[in-house]
């Protein structure tokens, strides 16, 4: 039995398909510069087409948010800096294209991996993925086609790239990898595809071969190779129980999210575009609590025009059939960059020029988005929120631009809804502390816990060295959440939460007790959260929440919740 990290829930038993990637051996050879440059350019063009092909196939199954990784790969393949350095080495050193590609790629990977910045460290993985495909094309090597798998299989690999994961078809019943974590691209995609996955499982590759039987328990993060009949029966029973629970949850699709003592909350979904709307509705979502509009920009090679954005927003609003849609205005910067916009070099871009800070400076970009949103507002129930608000002046300035745009459109004779709600993200501790003041001006709050926790604990959640400090259940974080809700309710304003915490089964009881009005999460989490809500007493959870606020540590909070739930 091998232990790993349960990254995408499920249990399955099937034959092993061991992913053997081509062994790339690069030799340094002298080459005729003109011929080698031509060979490189041809291979680069093929690489771009390969990535576009993978993205096109993946688009049938993945959301816009998950597809964004392929845009990053295409951006990398089209990066003139990368191509320029490789060509320069071919021409100046008289070496073959394969050797130049490997040398330049290694230098760039080493440089990015050494940077104290999440965005650039992630780019190192993109460079590896793209240049591996490029080197295979240069050498005439074939990358395994996972779409050709035609019998029930569990993939075992050192790692799965986004390109690999995007190719997984209905015959793939799960995968186990040596490395990776819950937030890796492959884990996120597996969740979206509802494929069981255990990652970070050292030794799994050496322990099995293609054709072995493998039991994959992605509920507890366990892998067993060639189990006996009794053990197989145990896992099959566990798989059946898990699937039965999923089926039972479906009956909750059209039910209200109401506690045992009659307190109702709203469970909504997070989306990256229109393609995600169906998932929210299928899973009984009562609205969209977060529409990440940055993917409209990241999927384009130019700033989307007003008309392009209008069509995208209209499509989502109509698709949600009158249910509330909360749109976050452009949240770019930090770890999200655009190929056609040059961001300033900053030591810490997560605390720098991003989101509303960029929009208040680049008002033309901001106004274009707001015009498109206002025009689309007549097609549904629209709420607009500004990200990364730190001061009341920022919110007032952003709201003033919205009012200006709205007035201009009305003067032009364009129909605009008179019931658009304008709110803000609470993801900076300063905003949470001053929530009662912000509530005088904002129509609603949406708490972005992913950033709020990072900024509160001064801990990069992607850094393995300090990830232990990323504590959603830390009493200090809970007090910021409580203060935000209290400040809003004092002024009759509602509060949502769109960070990962909103869908955590152990967090829901606390948040319910604190008075959170809207829980927005991945569509696949909605029904499970509804089951939790319907099993709880609001009055009892209020007592639990107060108890948790007075604990000393995150572990004590979690233990208190588990005890209350009888776990």
Residues covered by each model-derived region:
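Non-catalytic, soluble scaffold/interaction modules
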Residues: 1-302, 308-319, 325-332, 362, ...
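Conserved alpha/beta-domain cores
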Residues: 246-567
């Amino acid at each position: 039995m091998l232990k790993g990290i349960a990254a995408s829930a499920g249990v399955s038993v099937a034959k092993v398909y061991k992913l053997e990637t081509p062994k790339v051996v690069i030799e340094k050879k002298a080459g005729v510069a003109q011929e080698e440059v031509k060979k490189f350019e041809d291979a680069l063009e093929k690489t771009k087409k390969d990535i576009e092909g993978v993205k096109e196939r993946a688009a049938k199954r993945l959301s816009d948010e998950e597809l964004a990784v392929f845009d990053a790969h295409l951006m990398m393949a089209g990066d003139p800096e990368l191509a320029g350095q490789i060509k320069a080495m071919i021409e100046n050193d008289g070496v073959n294209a394969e050797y130049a590609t490997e040398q330049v790629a290694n230098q760039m990977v080493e440089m990015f991996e050494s940077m104290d910045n999440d965005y650039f460290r992630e780019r190192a993985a993109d460079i590896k993925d793209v240049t591996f495909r490029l080197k295979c094309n240069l050498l005439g090597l074939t990358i395994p086609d996972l779409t050709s798998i035609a019998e029930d299989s569990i993939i075992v690999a050192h790692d799965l790239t986004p390109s690999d994961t995007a190719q997984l078809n209905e015959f793939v019943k799960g995968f186990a990898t040596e490395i990776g974590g819950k937030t890796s691209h492959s884990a996120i995609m597996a969740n979206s595809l509802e494929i069981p996955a255990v990652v970070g499982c050292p030794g799994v590759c050496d322990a099995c071969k293609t054709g072995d039987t493998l039991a994959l328990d992605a509920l507890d993060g366990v892998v067993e190779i060639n189990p006996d009949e009794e053990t197989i029966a145990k896992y099959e029973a566990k798989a059946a129980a898990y699937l039965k629970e999923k089926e039972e949850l479906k009956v909750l699709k059209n039910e209200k999210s109401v506690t045992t003592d009659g307190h109702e909350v709203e469970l909504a979904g997070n989306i990256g575009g229109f393609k995600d709307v169906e998932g929210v509705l299928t899973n009984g979502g009562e609205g969209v609590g977060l529409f990440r509009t940055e993917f409209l920009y990241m999927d384009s090679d130019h700033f989307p025009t007003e008309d392009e954005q209008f069509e995208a927003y209209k499509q989502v609003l109509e698709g949600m059939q009158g249910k509330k849609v909360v749109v976050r205005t452009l949240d770019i910067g930090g770890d999200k960059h655009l190929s056609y916009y040059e961001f300033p070099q900053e030591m810490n871009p997560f605390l720098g020029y991003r989101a509303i800070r960029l929009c208040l400076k680049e008002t033309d970009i901001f106004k274009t988005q707001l015009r498109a949103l206002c025009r689309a507002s007549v097609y549904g129930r629209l709420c607009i929120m500004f990200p990364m608000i730190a001061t009341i002046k920022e919110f007032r300035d952003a709201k003033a631009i919205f009012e200006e745009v709205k007035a201009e459109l009305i003067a032009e004779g364009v129909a605009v809804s008179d019931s658009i709600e304008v709110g803000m993200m609470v993801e900076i501790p300063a905003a949470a502390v001053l929530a009662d003041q912000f509530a005088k001006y904002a129509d609603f709050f949406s708490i972005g816990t992913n950033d709020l926790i990072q900024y509160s604990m001064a801990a990069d959640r992607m850094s393995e060295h300090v990830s232990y400090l990323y504590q959603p259940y830390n009493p200090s974080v809970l007090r910021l959440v409580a203060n935000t809700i209290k400040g809003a309710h004092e002024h009759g304003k509602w509060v949502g939460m769109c960070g990962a915490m909103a869908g955590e089964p152990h967090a829901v009881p606390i948040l319910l007790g604190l008075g959170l009005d809207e829980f927005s999460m991945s569509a696949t989490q909605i029904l499970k959260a509804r089951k939790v809500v319907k099993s709880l007493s609001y009055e009892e959870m209020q007592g639990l929440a107060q108890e948790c606020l007075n604990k000393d540590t995150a572990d004590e909070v979690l233990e208190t919740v588990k005890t209350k739930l009888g776990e």
